[in-house]
């Protein structure tokens, strides 16, 4: 059982690399633009592959159009990748927009904003921050 899983994972990794090359070099569709293949999940029977992609654009409408263009070209992309990989059955490709990168950046910005707001409030009220308290303790120890 574990051996079968490792094979699907290896195929998913190779498929990710081949898809990235095909999408960068061989696709001439201007609707797609620059696309990054973040991850590929292959079903156990190798009949389906979920391809997680991101784009530079964050506009939902543009992202939907780009994913639709990829889905429309999935058969062509599949045939290009099949020529590069030695598989008996080439998985059917399903493209999915991966918003985890955008969400991660948004969460990071929120955390940074909260930290800076807390530091500003502490300075207004005359409360020392943890870093400043550590400096005064070291000076007192000397």
Curated annotation (Swiss-Prot):
Molecular function GO terms recorded: ribosomal small subunit binding
InterPro entries membership: KH_dom-like_a/b, RbfA, RbfA_dom_sf, Ribosome-bd_factorA_CS
GO CC terms, sorted: cytosol
Matching Pfam families: RBFA
Keyword set includes DNA-binding: no
PANTHER family named in the record: RIBOSOME-BINDING FACTOR A, CHLOROPLASTIC-RELATED
Family statement drawn from the similarity comment of this UniProt entry: Belongs to the RbfA family.
Name this protein carries in UniProt: Ribosome-binding factor A
Protein species of origin: Shewanella pealeana (strain ATCC 700345 / ANG-SQ1)
């Amino acid at each position: 059982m574990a051996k079968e899983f490792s094979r699907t994972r290896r195929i998913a990794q190779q498929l990710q690399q081949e898809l990235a090359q095909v999408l960068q070099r061989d696709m001439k569709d201007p609707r797609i633009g620059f696309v990054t293949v973040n991850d590929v999940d292959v079903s156990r029977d190798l009949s389906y592959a979920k391809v997680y992609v991101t784009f530079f654009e964050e506009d939902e409408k543009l992202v939907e159009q780009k994913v639709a263009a990829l889905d429309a070209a999935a058969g062509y992309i599949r045939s290009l990748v099949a020529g590069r990989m030695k598989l008996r059955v080439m998985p059917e490709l399903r493209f999915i927009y991966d918003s985890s990168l955008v969400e991660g950046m948004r969460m990071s910005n929120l955390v940074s904003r909260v930290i800076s707001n807390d530091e500003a409030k502490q300075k207004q009220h005359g409360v020392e921050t943890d870093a400043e308290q550590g400096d005064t303790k070291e000076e007192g120890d000397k």
